[in-house]
From Swiss-Prot:
Active site: D80
GO CC list: cytosol
Protein name: tRNA pseudouridine synthase D
Entry's Gene Ontology BP terms: tRNA pseudouridine synthesis
GO molecular function: RNA binding; tRNA pseudouridine(13) synthase activity
EC code: 5.4.99.27
Enzyme class: isomerase
SUPFAM superfamilies assigned to the protein according to its UniProt record, in alphabetical order: Pseudouridine synthase (SSF55120)
Catalysed reactions, as listed in the record: uridine(13) in tRNA = pseudouridine(13) in tRNA
Binding site residues for substrate: F27, N129, F329
Role description: Responsible for synthesis of pseudouridine from uracil-13 in transfer RNAs.
Organism classification: Bacteria, Pseudomonadati, Pseudomonadota, Gammaproteobacteria, Enterobacterales
Pfam families for this protein: TruD
């Protein structure tokens, strides 16, 4: 298995270094649900500004304040602890009376707004996230500047970030132990984290191998393509390659890579043979995913940060802003810019 730090770069390995997350204010995330609260219903959506706080810890504190069980509080996604984040939480509180959530107090947290909503906020139920990052002590301004320009055109590999694999790769190691021992895992959180890490690592490996080819955006026979921003896909045939290539070049279509699991992967012929070869040695993880009935899926190989802009405060400090769809990692963007330093550069929750 290719280590995360050794995954293939789209723009080549960065020439310089820089400090990421020198302080929480250097990594700002604003959650974009893509919808507004209904204004009625048995649930309450609460938007909270948090600084240096773990998502689960805030959810538990909110449940305690509302005097409800912790399972009655949900959120759309884990947010970085070592950052300033605006995040929505959802609490099931039936009844006509609206609790005074402005009275909720927790160090590092501030309630920004709240309103009733008809449906529970489920994991993954968000449109995306807006990021504002500050990179400090940049050693090669010219290299970073050119990379930002290139990313606007060519994007970055849509790798799952190092956070997905746990501190020191602990989630992936757990998945490997589970695969090797076949011992039942009762803890639902561990099951979820380990299976997710296994599938993410296989996806990253497929993308890394594809990037070693001459042109990662070259459509091959049997590729699974999806409309940009959509989840469904279709298979490319030899007769269509020229037209499909034009649509890929126009960013209308995205070439996908497999999220391996049970069932068909989605590719055929040349593309399927390539994907299978890319992870042929990772039989234990593949067997685990099939055994645990994790369905195979697809994910775009490349990621195009939207609304990308930047401002150099001086020759060694740059502020970068962009928006990413749900499930994408800001650290996978930064990885193509600089070799990051800093205690929390790769750490999330």
């Amino acid at each position: 298995m290719i280590e995360f730090d050794n995954l293939t770069y789209l723009h080549g390995k960065p020439q310089g270094t820089g400090l990421l997350k020198a302080n929480p204010e250097d990594f700002v995330v604003v959650e974009d649900l893509g919808f507004e609260p209904d204004g009625e219903g048995e649930h309450i959506l609460v938007r909270i500004l948090k600084n240096g706080c773990n998502t689960r810890f805030v959810a538990d504190a909110l449940a305690k304040f509302l005097k409800i069980h912790a399972r009655e509080v949900s959120f759309a996604g884990q947010k970085d602890k070592h950052a300033v984040t605006e995040q929505w939480f959802c609490a099931r509180v039936p009844g006509k009376e609206m609790p005074d959530l402005s009275a909720f107090q927790l160090e590092g947290c501030q309630v920004l707004e709240y309103a009733r909503h008809k449906r529970k906020l489920r994991l993954g139920a968000l449109k995306g996230n807006a990021f504002t990052l500050v990179l400090r002590d940049v050693s090669n301004r010219d290299d970073v500047e050119q990379r930002l320009i290139d990313i606007c055109v060519k994007g970055v590999p849509n790798y799952f970030g190092a956070q997905r694999f746990g501190i020191g790769g602990s989630n992936l190691q757990g998945a490997l132990r589970w695969a090797q021992t076949n011992t039942p895992v009762r803890d639902r959180n561990k099951r979820s984290f380990w299976l997710s890490a296994a599938r993410s690592a296989l996806f990253n490996q497929i993308v890394a191998e594809r990037l070693k080819k001459a042109d990662v955006n070259q459509v091959v026979d049997g590729d699974a393509l999806q409309l940009a921003g959509r989840g469904s896909w279709f298979v490319a045939t030899t007769e269509e390659l020229a037209e499909l290539q034009r649509r890929v070049n126009d960013k209308e279509l995205m070439i996908t890579a497999a999220l391996p699991g049970s069932g068909e992967w989605g590719t055929q012929r040349e593309a399927l043979a390539f994907e299978q070869a890319a992870v042929a040695e990772e039989t234990e993880l593949q067997t685990l995913l099939v055994r645990e009935k994790v369905e195979a899926a697809r994910r775009a190989m490349l990621l195009y940060p939207q609304q990308l802009s930047w401002n150099w405060w001086d020759d060694v400090t740059v502020e970068i802003r962009f928006w990413l769809p749900a499930g994408s990692f800001a650290t996978s963007v930064v990885r193509e810019l600089i070799n990051t330093t800093g205690e929390y550069a790769h750490i999330a929750e």
